[in-house]
């Protein structure tokens, strides 16, 4: 993305933390533009962006390891504010003459910070002498400070939990202010960008819309564009952005891969053809997808297969249209960060996403990904900016691979139909209970397990259905939704009574981490 319209930029240097993008999310909540760059290219990015302030991320590495990542010396020579988070604090100290050691007591999870001194970093949130909850995740710790630094906060296992050189406006925090488990963390980051860096709020979804449209036009030129429309919020917003940018150069293609929710394909076609006048082609490729997935139980192979087939179908449809040069996808930040570090940094791969991990290396179209830098809640705000109705914007996320990854084990048409019906009943019960908007994501999973049951006077041996519901802000962390047991009982009874093939229902109470939201 071009940053010419945003002279007040914060540069976030990524050392490989899985939650680096949450730092960006918190900065954007403060209506300040920021970019994440890997430490390997931070020198170039620093020169290009000329940021007003810099934030150094956490990392799975140890500062004491030979060859561990370092921040460019140029940022410390520039006279601008710097905030180091966890590893970022440690490398800042090490680079400026302090000391960091391994082997001390580690801190993982909730901890309590004692504020030792007042500071602009704490303004309006924490006062000297008070104690506050934070979230720690570190094995190393600072043991001596560089010249000019003082301790302004401590915790039981981190005597240098918050440090500051107020004159040079360098700050370090051993905890993670970017995660929701540090209740005041977002305000602390706002203090850094507004009070300390002095950047004024000016970056909004309206501004992003203009920037994205400009970027699409610049990338596409006069080329033909097709959009991978699924009917979800992400692809729909991407389609509307692309249509605003290039108009009739765009054709949307909806692939019915046989893995969508009940009646979803028809609902999407009606909405986009009738309400938004977008050129839309519906392709029934269900036989092709389900045939390729038949008997496949490995979740990574499922995702890769689905991604490969998507591209094959789009290329075929593009040829029917006389050729297309670009493919629009609704890829988001979390999609990419969980596949491989978006920034090229050393973060650990959790699982591939069909949008990024399944693409053939020799794809014949160039990708256009206007939402690649956004989180889910930002996409919803952008959708509202583009005029999408609240009822549509508030739909729960649905994965591109669809029901295939909610059907662990081998995929068959029969199992997909059973799952589709169970999922529809579950969501219907949620809506009738008025809970839909309180839940980030809810869905049914058909387990590759059969159990004995009794219905009437007969013995049954049928599948187990797992119900999943989570609360989340951005999809990076999540907690299971705490239903009333009567609700679960009613939902289970309906599913067992109305769906042939299921005789047992269970509820998933796993948070993220350690689990992921989806089962595969």
Curated annotation (Swiss-Prot):
Domain Glutamine amidotransferase type-1 per the UniProt entry, residue ranges: 9-202
The keyword ATP-binding belongs to this UniProt entry's keyword annotation: yes
EC code(s) of this entry: 6.3.5.2
Active site per database record: 86 (nucleophile), 176, 178
Keywords: ATP-binding, Glutamine amidotransferase, GMP biosynthesis, Ligase, Nucleotide-binding, Purine biosynthesis
Gene3D superfamilies, per database record: 3.30.300.10, 3.40.50.880, HUPs
Keyword Transferase: no
Domain of life of the source: Bacteria
Amino-acid positions noted as binding ATP in the UniProt annotation, renumbered to this chain: 230-236
Gene Ontology molecular function: ATP binding; GMP synthase activity
GO cellular component labels: cytosol
Residues annotated as domain GMPS ATP-PPase: 203-395
Protein function: Catalyzes the synthesis of GMP from XMP.
Oligomeric form and interacting partners: Homodimer.
Stated name of the protein: GMP synthase [glutamine-hydrolyzing]
Gene that encodes the chain: guaA
């Amino acid at each position: 993305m071009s940053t010419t319209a945003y002279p007040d930029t914060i540069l976030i240097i990524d050392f490989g933390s899985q939650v680096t993008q949450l730092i960006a999310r918190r900065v954007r909540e403060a209506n300040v533009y920021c970019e994440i760059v890997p430490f390997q290219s931070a020198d170039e990015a620093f020169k290009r962006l000329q940021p007003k302030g810099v934030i150094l991320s956490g990392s799975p590495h140890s500062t004491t390891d030979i060859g561990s990542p370092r921040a460019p010396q140029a940022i410390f020579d520039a006279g601008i504010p710097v905030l180091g988070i966890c590893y970022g604090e440690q490398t800042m100290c090490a680079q400026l003459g302090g000391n960091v050691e391994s082997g001390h007591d580690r801190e993982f999870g909730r901890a309590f910070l004692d504020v030792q001194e007042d500071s602009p970093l704490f303004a309006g949130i924490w006062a000297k002498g008070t104690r506050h909850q934070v979230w720690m995740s570190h094995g190393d710790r600072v043991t001596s400070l560089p010249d000019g630094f003082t301790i302004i906060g401590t915790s039981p296992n981190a005597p240098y939990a918050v440090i500051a050189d107020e004159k040079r406006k360098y700050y370090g925090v051993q905890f993670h202010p970017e995660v929701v488990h540090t209740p005041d963390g977002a305000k602390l980051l706002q203090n850094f960008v507004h009070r300390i860096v002095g950047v004024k709020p000016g970056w909004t979804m309206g501004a992003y819309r203009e920037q994205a449209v400009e970027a699409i036009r610049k990338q596409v030129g006069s080329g033909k564009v097709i959009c991978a429309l699924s009917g979800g919020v992400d692809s729909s917003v991407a389609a509307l952005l692309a249509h605003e940018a290039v108009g009739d150069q765009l054709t949307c293609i909806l692939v019915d891969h046989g893995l969508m929710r009940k009646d979803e394909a028809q609902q999407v076609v009606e909405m986009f053809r009738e309400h938004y006048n977008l050129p839309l082609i519906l392709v029934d490729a269900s036989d092709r997808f389900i045939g390729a997935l038949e008997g496949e139980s490995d979740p990574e192979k499922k995702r890769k297969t689905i991604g490969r087939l998507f591209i094959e179908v789009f290329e075929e449809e593009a040829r029917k249209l006389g050729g297309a040069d670009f493919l629009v996808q609704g890829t988001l930040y979390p999609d990419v960060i969980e596949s491989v570090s978006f920034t090229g940094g050393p973060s650990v791969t959790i699982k591939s996403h069909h949008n990024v991990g399944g693409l053939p290396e020799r794809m014949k179209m160039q990708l256009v990904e206007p939402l690649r830098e956004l989180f889910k809640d930002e996409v919803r705000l952008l959708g509202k900016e583009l005029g999408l109705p609240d009822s549509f914007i508030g739909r729960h996320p649905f994965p591109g691979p669809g029901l295939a990854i909610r059907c662990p084990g081998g995929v068959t048409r029969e199992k997909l139909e059973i799952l589709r019906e169970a999922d529809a009943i579950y969501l219907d019960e949620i809506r009738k209970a008025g809970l839909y908007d309180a839940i980030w994501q809810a869905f049914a999973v058909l387990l590759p397990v059969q159990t004995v049951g009794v219905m009437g006077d007969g013995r049954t041996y049928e599948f187990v259905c797992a119900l999943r519901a989570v609360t989340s802000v951005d999809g990076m962390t999540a907690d299971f939704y705490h239903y009333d047991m009567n609700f679960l009982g009613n939902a289970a009874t309906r599913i067992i009574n109305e769906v042939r093939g299921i005789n047992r229902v269970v509820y998933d109470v796993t948070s993220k981490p350690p689990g992921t939201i989806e089962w595969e």
